[in-house]
Structures are given as C-alpha cells and as structure tokens.
Amino acid sequence: MKAIVQVRGEVNQEQGVRDTLEMLNLDRVNHATLVPETDAYDGMVTKVNDWVAHGEPSADVVATLIERRAEPAAGEGDIDDEWVADNTDYDGVEALAEALVDEETTLQEAGVSPTLRLHPPRGGHDGIKHPTKEGGQLGKHTTEEIDTLLEAMR
C-alpha cells in the first residue's frame, strides 16, 4: 500500500495531471490517500510524481492517521475503535490499519472517506520544488521518510 500526499498546488498543472489527481481523490494541497500497489496506480503516481510525495507507510502511522484524520464516508463523526467495530469487519483501528497495509481492504471498502485531510507539516516542508534526492519533498520516499512526513502532518 502507498500513501500519497499532494504537496504542490494547481498552478501550472497540466490538465492530465489534474485529472489524475482527481482520480486519486486528491483535490487540494495537504490531502492524502492510501492506495494499493497495482500497475494502474503505479502509472498514476508516476504521472503526478512532481506534485506529490509518496511511499509505503508503517501500520502504526496509518493507525494514527485513521484515528486523527479519517472521516466516515457517510455521515459525520470520529473514527475510533468503537466505530470500526460497529461498521467494519475489524475489531479496532489497529486491526484496520494492519489490513490496509497488507492490502486486504481499502478505505472505501471499510466505509471511510478515501481522502484524509491533513494539517500542514509541523516545522514546514523540506522544500516543495525539489525531489527527495535533492533534499526536497517531491517523489518517492522511504518508509521512514514518509512516516516522518505523515507524523508531522497528523
């Protein structure tokens, strides 16, 4: 599973990039989504690589994101262990996070909104104009790097 975070805005975006971000359920800066690792999603991520940060997060970070930032797809409320037990096949947030990381389910299948609206990163971005190889935020991150970014945006 990959976490994809939109880091850059719409200025100077081509229409194809905008359409791809919309297909990924990313319509604003600092929004994130969790997608399975398939060829179709890999192609989409390649296309929007200059606008997003992406990587494979750990289950602990996914659980934190679900508890703090996830919203039910229908209705309002917070996602906690009780909500997960009542509305999904899983016992709690940790079990749902493990299932997401293992690609047993998706956010939509679990009844959770596919878009996670995150806070801007505490301490700021490392740079939204440069890829990770040059010390920026754009492109592919290691598990530790994406975990650090998502923790800062929790």
From Swiss-Prot:
UniProt keyword Ribonucleoprotein present: yes
Sample GO molecular function, one term: structural constituent of ribosome
Keywords: Ribonucleoprotein, Ribosomal protein
Gene Ontology cellular-component annotations: cytosolic large ribosomal subunit
Leader sequence residues: none
Biased composition (Basic and acidic residues): 123-133
Family classification: Belongs to the universal ribosomal protein uL30 family.
Protein name (database record): Large ribosomal subunit protein uL30
Annotated organism of origin: Natronomonas pharaonis (strain ATCC 35678 / DSM 2160 / CIP 103997 / JCM 8858 / NBRC 14720 / NCIMB 2260 / Gabara)
Lineage, broadest ranks: Archaea, Methanobacteriati, Methanobacteriota, Stenosarchaea group, Halobacteria
